[in-house]
């Protein structure tokens, strides 16, 4: 049985870790390399860096932070933000990323996903999906893709887009609920489950973790293969070890350090 992964996420802006609520109201949470080293020591299964300034301000990705983190840490590292070309993917992989997250560019051109997966292997291509519920209370649930850090609506159905990019070669999908992001009210389980049921690749649940039971629900109810969280770890509400123990006690297969 594949073990469930816990993935702390470091949102990086101007070289600092930040954490916002629904992609806004950013507050400083520390140095990314030091944070990464702490998560590595704590037993995190993977780490995710998202350069949240890159897409909408046309910033380059944080290669210096990535390379210093890769030198200091042994856990797999996913890096996203501002990835627009195959050359961007290559540069991040050479800097030390194990996987590269593609967001806005995949929405603009799903064939870019196929091109990157063919060149580097689908195992290192993660498509990041930022979605917001657009259906009314009496309608069937429907979510729309947003790009550029959640600023631009696209009119694209999130579940259909997930199906498209998984067929084009995405090895994994990072699904973030913009409605839940930073609220500490739990994942959007319906969104996570809808996408997990629609694709054959692993889904990472993201956006809204407030407690350890939310992590369990993301896997058990949402069908996620991995759970991503930020605030509960960054600000000391829980440790990665506590999260793993809680999930294991709930019957989920976890990688537990001796």
Curated annotation (Swiss-Prot):
- One Gene Ontology term, aspect cellular component: cytoplasm
Please give the superkingdom of this protein's source.
Answer: Bacteria
Record key words, sorted? Amino-acid biosynthesis, Cytoplasm, Histidine biosynthesis, Lyase
Reactions mediated catalytically: 5-[(5-phospho-1-deoxy-D-ribulos-1-ylimino)methylamino]-1-(5-phospho-beta-D-ribosyl)imidazole-4-carboxamide + L-glutamine = D-erythro-1-(imidazol-4-yl)glycerol 3-phosphate + 5-amino-1-(5-phospho-beta-D-ribosyl)imidazole-4-carboxamide + L-glutamate + H(+)
What metabolic or biological pathway is this protein involved in?
Answer: Amino-acid biosynthesis; L-histidine biosynthesis; L-histidine from 5-phospho-alpha-D-ribose 1-diphosphate: step 5/9
InterPro entries on file: Aldolase_TIM, His_biosynth, HisF, IGPS_HisA/HisF, RibuloseP-bd_barrel
Q: What is its EC number?
A: 4.3.2.10
Q: Pfam families, from UniProt?
A: His_biosynth
Which CDD domains does UniProt cross-reference here?
A: HisF (cd04731)
UniProt main location, coarse: cytoplasm
User: What protein family does this chain belong to?
Assistant: Belongs to the HisA/HisF family.
Quaternary data: Heterodimer of HisH and HisF.
Q: What is this protein called?
A: Imidazole glycerol phosphate synthase subunit HisF
């Amino acid at each position: 049985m594949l073990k469930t992964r816990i993935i702390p996420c470091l949102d990086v802006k101007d070289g600092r870790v930040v954490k916002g609520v629904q992609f806004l109201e950013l507050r400083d949470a520390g140095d990314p390399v030091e944070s990464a080293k702490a998560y590595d020591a704590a037993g995190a299964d993977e780490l995710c860096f998202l350069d949240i300034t890159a897409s909408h301000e046309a910033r380059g990705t944080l290669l210096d932070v990535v390379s210093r983190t890769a030198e200091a840490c042994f856990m797999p590292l996913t890096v996203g933000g501002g990835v627009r070309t195959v050359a961007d993917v290559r540069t991040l992989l050479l800097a030390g990323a194990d996987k590269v997250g593609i967001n806005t560019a995949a929405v603009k051109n799903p064939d870019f996903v196929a091109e990157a997966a063919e060149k580097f292997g689908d195992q290192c291509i993660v498509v990041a999906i930022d979605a917001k519920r657009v259906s009314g209370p009496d309608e069937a649930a429907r979510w729309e893709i947003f790009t550029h850090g959640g600023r631009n609506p696209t009119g694209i159905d999130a579940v259909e887009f997930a199906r498209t990019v998984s067929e084009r070669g995405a090895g994994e999908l990072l699904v973030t609920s913009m409605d839940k992001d930073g609220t500490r009210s739990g994942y959007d389980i319906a969104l996570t489950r809808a996408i997990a049921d629609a694709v054959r690749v692993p889904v990472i649940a993201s956006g809204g973790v407030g407690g350890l039971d939310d992590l369990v629900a993301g896997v058990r109810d949402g069908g996620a293969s991995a759970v991503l969280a930020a605030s509960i770890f960054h600000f000391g509400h829980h440790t990665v070890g506590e999260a793993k123990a809680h999930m294991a006690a709930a019957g989920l297969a976890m990688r537990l350090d001796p």
